Regions:
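Short coil/turn linking the two alpha-helices of tandem helical-hairpin repeats
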Residues: 157-161, 166, 203, 229-238, ...
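C-terminal substrate/ligand-recognition segments
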Residues: 103, 107, 354-468
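Conserved, well-structured interaction surfaces
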Residues: 39-48, 52-58, 62, 82-162, ...
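An aromatic- and glycine-enriched ligand-binding surface/loop that stacks and positions planar moieties
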Residues: 20-91, 193-194, 198, 213-395
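Bacterial Sec-dependent N-terminal signal peptides
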Residues: 1-29
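Long, intrinsically disordered, low-complexity segments
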Residues: 19-20, 113-116, 187-189, 210, ...
Length: 556
């Protein structure tokens, strides 16, 4: 079913903006946009085009990369020094927090997030001439809300990374000054509060037609994140423009309320099987609220950076050892790169918590139903022959948790990521699993944290007694919580949402990102690393309109 929506989104060939410039256009042929929009049946497809830029966000050169590699949940060691994953120290800079404004990933996050927001604004402008007919059909608020909420998500990714960003709500080529972080937060929150009501509540009947698109559940989940993290974004009761917020506690109370709207919708539930959220066919998950729809077998689109930035999901290719191609019949040989730091793995209850590593003695014979791989890579499921890396000195492929060095690791160092089901029949070149952006488990854990911070003991007790809340742990083999403090909640969120784009902001909220220390990353002298630098090229081409974030040397 999910492929239907990919085809709908691919009507971008009829009405499109290019990613290469903020307002540059490529004309692919007829019909024109006006002709398309004259047919009300096509409006939903035209609005669906606005999701085209979302697929660029989960690449390791993009938003997913800068958020994941910069935390304690991921490391990219140089293997076979000077050859594998060196890239002149590029990945090391994210692991040890020594990045600069020249790093190309920042430029690409800036480009694609802005391009997505501009595309939303363009389509909004194209709906205005047919506003009356859409209103008559009862569709205007629905479609404009979808575009505005999706625009919020694009700007949220930009804001979450850089803080001070230009924020446009109309389709214009005019450059605008950067807004301060609290101003951006206010705009996002105000828009989401106003528009969420017009989006569909997901039901069994409308799930398919709204899959991968903005819904009320998606909007309120994003809103809850913004309220929960308000302080970490520099928002205070004094600069907050939202009526009724007079103390920091009010931010948490609003977060609790937004989460409750998602809960009360009855649209979502905690799946019995944790891994069903990440299956190749995960479109039927009742837990996933917002996903990036994937098609692992379609054409490769990329940008010319080292390794080529892609709009295809390659999360297992990034991590698995080379020999998995032989063992599991993957189309391409995996890249033997990204892995888990050993200290991060220690947060799991080994042999109990299935979100953790498999039995290191079983390897590929016993890794099904575990999120991290350790042990030998066998020739096949029924063979006891351990594969060797023939072009790497015939070293047997036996994955170990220890990483010997960030700059001189072995090819076997570091647990490999298995949360997303691997295609073992060679059906697709890229991952066909839809990439999860928002999950219901996050809603429940956010509500608990916000209630705890607000001093709402009754809500915390209510959640601890909730079967869905406790199932998050019991389904993976862990004991339910009888009590839960913030330190344990941070650890639990790390276990539950590994590599799901939440860890960096979690650490910032707990003041443990810049000021924390872990494998290869020392404690910083100040918190300026909580924000990434504005790309140097962006500043240089702004005509003096935009300035660098504090703490970064613009000459580097």
């Amino acid at each position: 079913m999910k492929k239907i929506f990919i085809l709908a989104f691919m009507t971008v060939a009829m009405l499109s903006t290019s990613c290469t410039g903020m307002l540059d256009e490529e004309v692919f042929g007829r019909p024109t946009s006006e002709e398309m929009l004259s047919n009300a049946e096509n409006v939903a497809k035209v609005v669906g085009q606005a999701y085209a830029e979302v697929n660029w966000l989960h690449d390791h050169w993009g938003y997913w990369g800068i958020n994941t590699i910069s935390t304690d949940e991921c490391v990219v060691p140089v293997r076979n020094p000077g050859q594998d994953w060196s890239d002149d120290g590029y990945w090391k800079g994210f692991n040890d927090h020594s990045w600069t404004a020249n790093d190309v990933s920042f430029e690409y996050v800036w480009q694609f997030s802005n391009a997505g927001a501009v595309l939303c604004n363009k389509i909004l402008s194209q709906l205005e001439p047919i506003k009356a007919s859409l209103q008559e059909a009862g569709l205007y608020n629905r479609f404009t809300a979808e575009l505005k909420v999706l625009r919020c998500y694009y700007y949220y990714t930009l804001f979450d990374a850089f803080g001070r960003i230009p924020y446009l709500e109309d389709y214009s080529s005019a450059a605008v000054p950067q807004s301060e972080t609290w101003q951006v937060w206010n705009k996002l929150v105000t828009t989401l509060e106003e528009e969420a009501q017009y989006l569909p509540i997901i039901t069994e009947q409308n799930h398919s037609e709204n899959y991968g698109r903005c819904s009320q559940g998606m909007a309120y989940t994003l809103l809850a994140r913004l309220y929960l993290n308000a302080s970490s974004y520099g928002v205070t009761p004094s600069n907050c423009g939202v009526e009724g917020i007079t103390s920091e506690k009010d931010f948490y109370t609003r977060c609790v309320a937004c989460c409750q709207k998602v809960i009360d919708s009855k649209s979502y539930k905690i799946e019995d099987n944790f891994f069903s959220n990440f299956f190749i066919h995960n479109e039927n998950s009742k837990e996933n609220i917002f996903v990036i729809v994937e098609d692992g077998n379609s054409a490769f689109n990329y940008r010319d950076v080292a390794g080529k930035m892609s709009n295809k999901l390659r999360i297992t290719n990034l991590s698995l050892n080379y020999c998995f191609q032989t063992c599991w019949n993957t189309v391409d040989k995996p890249w033997n790169g990204f892995c888990a730091p050993e200290d991060f793995l220690k947060r799991y209850e080994w042999g109990v918590d299935h979100r953790g590593p498999c039995d290191k003695n079983a390897g590929t014979h016993g890794c099904d139903g575990w999120a991290w791989f350790l042990g030998p890579v066998y020739e096949s499921e029924n063979s006891d022959v351990i594969l060797k890396m023939e072009d790497k000195g015939n070293v047997p492929a036996v994955i170990v948790p220890k990483i010997t060095s960030l700059t001189d690791a072995t090819h076997n160092d570091g647990a490999r990521f298995l949360k997303y089901e691997v295609d073992k029949i060679g059906a697709n070149k890229y991952c066909d699993n839809d990439f999860v952006l928002f999950r219901y488990a996050d809603v429940l854990y956010m509500q608990y944290e916000a209630a705890y911070r607000a001093g709402n003991d009754s809500k915390c007790s209510e959640l601890l007694a909730d079967s869905d809340f406790q199932k998050i742990r019991t389904r993976v083999g862990c004991s339910p919580y009888s009590s839960l403090d913030l330190d344990e909640l941070l650890n639990e969120r790390g276990r539950e949402f590994a590599w799901e784009l939440v860890r960096r902001r979690d650490l910032i909220r707990f003041n443990k990102f810049s000021m924390g220390s872990w494998d290869y990353k020392p404690k910083a002298k100040d918190n300026h690393w909580d924000w990434f630098p504005i790309p140097r090229k962006v500043i240089e081409t702004s005509g003096g309109l935009w300035t660098q974030n504090p703490g970064y040397d613009t000459d580097k």
